[in-house]
Amino acid sequence: MKRNLLILLTILVCGAVASCKPGQKKNVDMENQKETMLKIETSLGDIKVKLYNETPKHRDNFIKLAKEGMYNGTLFHRVIKDFMVQAGDPDSKNAPKGKMLGAGDVGYTIPAEFVYPKYFHKKGALSAARQGDNVNPNKGSSGCQFYIVTGKVYNDSTLLGMEQQMNENKLTNIFNALAQKHMKEIYKMRKANDEDGLYDLQEKLFAQAQEEAAKQPEFHFTKEQIEAYTTVGGTPHLDGEYTVFGEVVDGMD
């Protein structure tokens, strides 16, 4: 773990590569089909990544910072086995041993760009770090910090259990949002020790939450997700929570 903290970074923009299907003619729309490739040079070897065009704000920001040299000399400051490796903290440049890292930023955030379920947290996914929902309910991304998914392989039954949990979480989130709108009323009831009133309100809000949840489709992993998570692996519980804006194409190992 300590050795991984010393992985120095340099990110170079390699250029754009067109992705045509066999037999497809090149035309004026070709510019929209090019994918930017970057090389992340580390003290343990090079990693080549491509950036998705469907997440233009994240793509352009990443390219901008790379060209400015912002990432040069930074560290992979957070390395968690079977989960991910995180980098991009400007405070990690020349950081002394033992310094707490992870809070550095560039003074701005990027609006979330979820292209889900097309892009998800399979092994090798390049994603943007962000602050938690309690201070960042819109899930905006850090302006500079990113992570690469290492993850682990899951079996079908585990993924099924995760689907069930995500659907239960949806109901809980709806209930909490409804309760938040009644906080003044709840506070008054608590202050007055009105247990019956609190119980009745809870039942009312829970019924509303169930009704609202029933209007939304149940969550299920796609065939592509199941195939990836049961073979190469990943971190499925992050799907739809963090912006995936690219992927590793070489150097993952």
Language-model segments: what does each one mean?
Residues M1-K26:
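Bacterial Sec-dependent N-terminal signal peptides
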Residues C20-D253:
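Cyclophilin-like peptidyl-prolyl cis-trans isomerases
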